[in-house]
Swiss-Prot record:
<dbReference type="InterPro" id="IPR001017">
    <property type="entry name" value="DH_E1"/>
</dbReference>
<keyword id="KW-0786">Thiamine pyrophosphate</keyword>
<comment type="subunit">
    <text>Heterodimer of an alpha and a beta chain.</text>
</comment>
<dbReference type="Pfam" id="PF00676">
    <property type="entry name" value="E1_dh"/>
</dbReference>
<protein>
    <recommendedName>
        <fullName>Pyruvate dehydrogenase E1 component subunit alpha</fullName>
        <ecNumber>1.2.4.1</ecNumber>
    </recommendedName>
</protein>
<dbReference type="GO" id="GO:0004739">
    <property type="term" value="F:pyruvate dehydrogenase (acetyl-transferring) activity"/>
</dbReference>
<keyword id="KW-0560">Oxidoreductase</keyword>
<dbReference type="InterPro" id="IPR050771">
    <property type="entry name" value="Alpha-ketoacid_DH_E1_comp"/>
</dbReference>
<comment type="function">
    <text>The pyruvate dehydrogenase complex catalyzes the overall conversion of pyruvate to acetyl-CoA and CO(2). It contains multiple copies of three enzymatic components: pyruvate dehydrogenase (E1), dihydrolipoamide acetyltransferase (E2) and lipoamide dehydrogenase (E3).</text>
</comment>
<dbReference type="InterPro" id="IPR017596">
    <property type="entry name" value="PdhA/BkdA"/>
</dbReference>
<dbReference type="InterPro" id="IPR029061">
    <property type="entry name" value="THDP-binding"/>
</dbReference>
<dbReference type="GO" id="GO:0009083">
    <property type="term" value="P:branched-chain amino acid catabolic process"/>
</dbReference>
<keyword id="KW-0670">Pyruvate</keyword>
Amino acid sequence: MAPKLQAQFDAVKVLNETQSKFEMVQILDEDGNVVNEDLVPDLTDEQLVELMERMVWTRILDQRSISLNRQGRLGFYAPTAGQEASQLASQYALESEDFILPGYRDVPQIIWHGLPLTDAFLFSRGHFKGNQFPEGVNALSPQIIIGAQYIQTAGVAFGLKKRGKNAVAITYTGDGGSSQGDFYEGINFASAYKAPAIFVIQNNNYAISTPRSKQTAAETLAQKAISVGIPGIQVDGMDALAVYQATLEARERAVAGEGPTVIETLTYRYGPHTMAGDDPTRYRTSDEDAEWEKKDPLVRFRKYLEAKGLWNEDKENEVVERAKSEIKAAIKEADNTEKQTVTSLMDIMYEEMPQNLAEQYEIYKEKESK
């Protein structure tokens, strides 16, 4: 018989102490008031306005994309309204040499990282040109397999380190993605090799229709970073300043050789999971939606800038009209893009085409010429 222990190891106490360390970081409250002066980022007035312009522009893009999808002019589309601060403020903290590995809802980040809007529309339509990013756009195509981008990001970040680049790789997934095995494998590899990576979990409370409460017993998703020995932080994802500052500091750590960081942004998607038949009213209440609408990242940031005399209705209307004009031009260009063919796809696959495919190529070439 084993000897009776004289004292107990209180595992629950250790867990509670660990979880208590992950308090949500916030700089702006819902009314746009600064609640933590020490954390306010060092952004110029011009930069603050530029970030707001991008958020407004992206909200219009979301509205138009939903409309275009319903008209049959866009294919797959995952709405972004509500997540603008989480997406765009984090991207704003990056440099052009940094790599973005987006999920399927993260097209706005790569647009602002240099991807032409027309190409984003072509990606939605399944046109191969939508995956041929222009030279200098350091990003990969949006990942459809949930969580897979975390492994890829670890590899890209490790490659940047091996090449001595002063750059980072950043990726995004949702709360549901943090339950995937690829999530752990990615952050563990990056941790082990101190790869310059930033792993963003955009916690919008639902993995499609599965609520956050049924996905994990962890009090926060940021604390999952502890398992691989790297920092994790939870921020108010509706607060552009908090998201920006958290990402900026994570980037500084990464390029200094201190390894990756996990950032959990508490956010919300106002629309459906995707435009492929999801109905959020079946799993969300109108009261819940109303509570999160009070936290709208655009409203909050708008109030902050108005109080500083940097924003007004005329300025916003100007951005809205510019967005509509640019979106109209981009979708027209996408409409006029030459229809893809089997041979045009094969042309970009091989430098020297294998004999068996070369024979098939000639067959399709003849068919397409008729």
